[in-house]
């Protein structure tokens, strides 16, 4: 696979200069990865434009190559091209480093659990085809954290209505629910369905991230799909209390899987 020409996009420009600097040092992709604490495969992905660098990676690259904020200055342009909402790229960076994730989703199956077809259906409204595919690719890229050697522990609370709210038609929804059942078997993923008659009315969906040695972060999505990154300790603590309240109303793991299977049968 050949990377795109550096004139095509900020990401391609970034990739071209990353490879140029790496080869100038005589370093292999794994060797560079070891120096900046990422895998050689991620270095390869960045150079092929299939992976987006995080802000921390940009800063580390400048450090090891002895550059004055060259890659860091490119980061906002790379993020801008993804079409992600304000605050979300920073959240995605924090998500990639998280050791634990707690999330509540009230409208759709959460992004890191979505199949490509389901994600495309969810994101399609009002998007130009090229931007849509960038958004889908970014969402699929985020899911790689679930498959890494030491994945985060994820506890997901899904409102029961998301199991019946169809995106993309019957077959797309069927594949999505089957995928959800597969994920529920993974030891680091805990999925709980919140019954529709639970006496709760949270304002919107949210995710809380925890990392060893780092302060917690959160992302809250409100009506209309607008979201914001949260680093206020008090607000994050309130979300933690809300998460536990919702979890107290949710089904256990076994009953949650039964609810997903029932939704499958009713398609």
Predicted regions and their residues:
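Short hydrophobic/aromatic-rich motifs at helix boundaries and adjacent loops
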Residues: 1-2, 11-14, 28-33, 80-82, ...
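Basic, Lys/Arg-rich alpha-helical nucleic-acid-recognition elements, primarily the DNA-binding modules
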Residues: 1-79
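Short, charged recognition helix plus adjacent turn
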Residues: 4, 72-104
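Short secondary-structure junction/hinge motifs that connect adjacent elements
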Residues: 34-36, 91, 258-261
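Short secondary-structure transition/capping segments
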Residues: 43, 82, 202-205
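Short, structured secondary-structure boundary patches
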Residues: 52-54, 65, 91-94, 215
């Amino acid at each position: 696979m050949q990377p795109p020409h550096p004139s095509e996009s900020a990401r391609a420009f970034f990739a071209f200069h990353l490879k140029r600097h790496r080869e100038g040092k005589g370093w292999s992709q794994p060797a560079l990865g070891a120096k900046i604490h990422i895998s050689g495969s991620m270095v390869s992905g960045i150079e092929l434009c299939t992976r987006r660098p995080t802000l921390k990676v940009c800063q580390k690259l400048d450090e090891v190559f002895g550059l004055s904020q060259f890659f860091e200055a490119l980061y906002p342009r790379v993020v801008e091209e993804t079409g992600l909402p304000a605050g979300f790229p920073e959240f995605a960076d924090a998500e990639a480093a998280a050791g634990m994730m707690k999330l509540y989703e009230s409208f759709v199956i959460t992004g890191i659990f979505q199949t490509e077809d389901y994600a495309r259906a969810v994101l399609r409204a009002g998007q130009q085809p090229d931007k849509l595919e960038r958004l889908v690719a970014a969402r699929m890229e985020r899911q790689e954290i679930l498959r890494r050697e030491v994945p985060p522990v994820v506890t997901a609370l899904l409102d029961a209505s998301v199991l019946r709210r169809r995106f993309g038609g019957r077959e797309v929804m069927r594949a999505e629910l089957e995928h959800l059942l597969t994920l529920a078997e993974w030891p680091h993923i805990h999925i709980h369905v919140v019954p529709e008659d639970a006496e709760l009315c949270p304002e919107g969906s949210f995710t809380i991230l925890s990392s060893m040695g780092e302060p917690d972060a959160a992302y809250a999505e409100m009506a209309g799909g607008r979201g914001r990154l949260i680093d206020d300790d008090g607000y994050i603590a309130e979300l933690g209390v809300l998460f536990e309240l919702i979890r107290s109303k949710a089904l256990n793991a076994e009953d949650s899987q039964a609810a997903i299977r029932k939704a499958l049968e009713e398609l």
